[in-house]
Each structure stands twice: as C-alpha cells, then as structure tokens.
Amino acid sequence: RRINRSKDKNSTTLVKNIPYGSGLSGGVRNKRWYQKNRENILEYQKWVEDWGEELFRVLKPGAYALVFNSTRTSAHIQVALENVGFYARDTIVWRRQSGIPKGLNAEKKLESMGNPNAKKWHGWHSALRNEWEAITVVQKPLVNNYLNTIKLYNVGLMKTKSPNFEGFQSNIIENIKRDPKNEYNSHITVKPLDLIEKLVDMIIPKIDGNIVIDPFLGSGTTAVAAINLGIEWIGIELNPDYVEIAKKRVNEAINHSKIQQISLDL
C-alpha cells in the first residue's frame, strides 16, 4: 500500500532485504511435510509477485532490483519477479566471512541414541556449511537498447570500475567487514553498510532524479548508504521499532554529511 503512493516510473533502483521464506525445518519428512513445504514456497512466491508488481510500476525502464534471499528461495524470487515483468540479469554472491553448519550431524545423533554404527557416519551431515547469500538481480526492460535507455532515464548499466575496488567488478563480493555493534540497533539481519554502499554505487549513477527505494528498510542501512553516497532515497518500514532505529541512524548519517534531504515513509 505504501508503494502505491509512488508515481509511475519515478524511482531508479531497489535494494531489498525481504523475509527469506526458507520453509519448514523440523518435523517428520512424510508426504504431508513435503506437500506443506511446497505450499509454503508457492505462497511466498505469490507474495513476492504482489509487491514486485508495484515495484515494477514505479521503477524507471532499465532500473535494477536487487533482492537478498536464501540459496533455497532464490529461484522462486527470480521467477516471481519475471512473472511481473522484470528481466533476469544475474545472481550476485555475497560471500560472508563465516557460516554456521546447520542440520543433522548423523554421527553425534546416532551416538546419543547408542547406535553401534555411529562412527561409520563420521563427517556426514544433512547440509553443507552456508557461507554465502544470494542477491537476485533483475532489471526493468530497456527502451530498445542500453544507450537509448541511459539517454532517456539515466539508468540501465552497472559500474564495473571504481576506486573502491581493483579490476573489473565480478558477481562475487567478499571481504566485506561487519559493522560494529551498537547499543540500540536490535535488527537481527542487519546487512553491512559497506556492502549496501557497494551495491547502490554499482547500479545507480549519481545523476539528479535517480532515487534509491527500499520497501523493506529495516534499520535503515540502505538510507544511510544513500546519504553517504549523496543519492536521494525513499524508505518504507512497517515495524515501529525498526522505524525508530532507522530514524536515529539516518539522523546520525545526516549529521556527518552535507546532504540534508530525508525521505522516510512511516
């Protein structure tokens, strides 16, 4: 509903941190379990289509949408956004500094049950250690070609060279340091500011009229990144606790910046 307020073709890009919809975890893996898991992921895909349709409307032709998601749901995110009109471009890999193994350790579980064959399952696990997150990259279709689109709308290309990194930018991003913890930011999935700044800088030229929109603003990292880069932004967040955190972070960023424009949709 908040996105409905935005004008058609008004915004230039999108950096998002949505609920991941990773599905069921525990329970007996019977037919009903798999059926319910399938129903959940299809409901999740439909939910993505619902907000994706509105985002497609407000973005300029050639604008990119970047969507953080889990490795288990990235395919459904891409299909959902393609269904509403976006064109699939890439998947960016954000390689984190560490990952915690999750799932069943067969040897330890069998040992706790007194199973004599436990040692035979040494090193066997129900999942790999996950140390990367998928960032689905889609684009609103161009107007005929890239050059025509950038002349009309000032978006459509990706920055591949920058003083912030060496060589030609790849679709694997790593060596991003975590932000230091502070006493007031209680958001559980805060993305590193350096990462979000890198992504915004990669897909949005610093040209008047370009606006970053984040419909899942959370604690405000996208807003802070935009302020630091000197780019206008729109943030939408429904959780009142996160809104207050975002306001505090935005005000701190403004105090350290010459940019005095703030757009925070409550």
Predicted regions located by residue number:
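S-adenosyl-L-methionine-dependent nucleic acid methyltransferase catalytic domains
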Residues: 1-266
